[in-house]
From Swiss-Prot:
One of its GO terms (biological process) is cysteine biosynthetic process from serine. It catalyses: L-serine + acetyl-CoA = O-acetyl-L-serine + CoA. Its EC number is 2.3.1.30. GO terms for molecular function: serine O-acetyltransferase activity. It holds the Pfam family Hexapep. It is found in: Cytoplasm. GO terms for cellular component: cytoplasm. Pathway: Amino-acid biosynthesis; L-cysteine biosynthesis; L-cysteine from L-serine: step 1/2. It comes from Staphylococcus xylosus. This is Serine acetyltransferase. The keyword Ribosomal protein does not apply. Keywords: Acyltransferase, Amino-acid biosynthesis, Cysteine biosynthesis, Cytoplasm, Repeat, Transferase.
Length: 216
């Protein structure tokens, strides 16, 4: 019981550290869906370890209904996990998450197919995964990594790295920029790039640089 209360205290403190909108302990305990999902998972995970699979899964599904956050009862979660906003977060069965991790809404820690066994990612300590990011497969995100919004990460990432894009690629490691770096405001828009290319092709057609071989 004391261990569980210590866990609650640590989780509440993590919210205050990560969310400037948090005002009081009562507000965090009563109003933050992310902490509700984590605390519910602690119970479901204990039942899962005792092979009470149906009851564990039932708790998980009820929690998803009320919070919008789906954590499989088999997932292993470290201390001070903060799920901010949380709607649409999915954490798979064989996922392992370290301490002091922050996850935003729409994040998926999932698999890449129907294989059995270890098929979900491992997340190290002090990792931040921004809104909408997908981390897929049996890969390792090492400690102190930042993953940008809407990134799709399919390969393991070394410590002290920043990853953005689809597919995810490292733009900063050990404090040094690698290649061309984009912040969230300047990430490339693939649709815009395709439209620009189409405009170039149309301009070439108008100028006679491209001959139309079709006869109508």
């Amino acid at each position: 019981m004391f261990k569980f209360l210590k866990r609650i205290k640590d989780d509440v403190n993590m919210v205050f550290e990560q969310d400037p909108a948090a005002r009081t302990t009562l507000e965090v305990i009563t109003s933050y869906a992310g902490v509700h999902a984590v605390w519910s998972h602690l119970i479901a995970h204990e039942l899962y370890k005792k092979k009470k699979y149906v009851l564990a899964r039932l708790i998980s599904q009820v929690t998803r209904f009320f919070t919008g956050i789906e954590i499989h009862p088999g997932a292993q979660i470290g201390r001070r996990l903060f799920i901010d906003h949380g709607m649409g977060v999915v954490i798979g069965e064989t996922c392992r998450i370290g301490d002091n991790v922050t996850i935003y809404q729409g994040v998926t820690l999932g698999g890449t197919g129907k294989e059995r066994g270890k098929r979900h990612p491992d997340i190290g300590d002090n990792v931040l995964i921004a809104a909408g990011a997908k981390v897929l497969g049996n890969i390792t995100i090492n400690a102190n990594v930042n993953i940008g919004a809407n990134s799709v990460v399919l390969n393991s990432v070394p410590s002290y790295s920043t990853v953005v894009g689809i597919p995810g690629h490292i733009v900063k490691q050990d404090g040094r920029r690698i290649g061309k770096t984009f912040d969230h405001r300047n990430l490339p828009d693939p649709i815009y790039e395709q439209l620009k290319e189409l405009e170039k092709q149309l301009e070439k057609t108008r100028n006679g640089e491209i001959q139309d071989d079709y006869i109508i």
